[in-house]
Amino acid sequence: LETEEINRIMERAIRSSDRWRSMKREGKSEEQIRASFKEKREMTVFDWNSDTQEKDTIMTPLDSIRYYKTFLRSAMMSMEPQTGHVKAWVGGLNYKHFQYDNVIQGSRQAGSTFKPFVYAAAIDQLRYSPCDELPDSQYCIEAGKHGNMEPWCPKNSNGKYSGQMYTLKHALANSVNTVTAQLIDRVGPKPVVQIVNDLGLTRDILEVTSIALVTEEFNVYDML
């Protein structure tokens, strides 16, 4: 990351911290609050290498924020498809030190996990079958179509085009962006959004072609 981006991340974390909010409520000035973030103090922090997953240390609150930013935040939710029963729910590393549930609170761009909705809409609306074939070649949707402000020409993840004909089954299994672009062009964004809503994601989603490769953000709970 560039220094400017790191500084933005740190500033956002400082201002959203309990310390900042608490001192603001007490009427402390911004100068006083920032000074308190630079004062060393005893604290207990999360530690992977400890049996208790904790260690006692001395650091500034600012250093503690920087320390916690080094941990990868992830989440997992496992559900039994036949019943909908939740079998596992892991919202983070350690709730005592990371009181944030990434399953339901943390949203991220869904990326290729959104592609099955595009394929489902094409199969439902256009009566395609998994055995139908489309070419893996450069494909553009012109400006003005489907509400596009400018031409949309997605590339495959490797930046290459094989020129081969792929079945929908193969294209989805291998996450071929060019085939997904052709499908959303043919079926249109609206039926894709409708099928997403019908499957339980009842939220506003922009009806634009780029949702096929997903610019929208969802949490793990939404996607299950």
Model-derived features: where do they sit?
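Generic alpha-helical secondary structure signal
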Residues: E4, Y166, K190-P191
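Sec-exported extracytoplasmic/periplasmic mature domains
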Residues: A122-R127, Y139, A173-N177, D185-P189, ...
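Mid-domain, small-residue-enriched loop/turn segments at the edges of structured enzyme/sensor domains
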Residues: N148-N156, K160, V187-L224
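Membrane-targeting and insertion segments and their boundary/processing signals
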Residues: K87-A88, G163-Y166, H170, V196-G200
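Peptidoglycan glycan-strand catalytic modules in the bacterial/periplasmic cell-wall system
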Residues: N94, S162-M165, L172-N177, I184-G188, ...
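Extended, non-catalytic substrate-recognition/exosite surfaces adjacent to catalytic cores, especially
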Residues: L1-K145, N156-S157, K169, Q182, ...
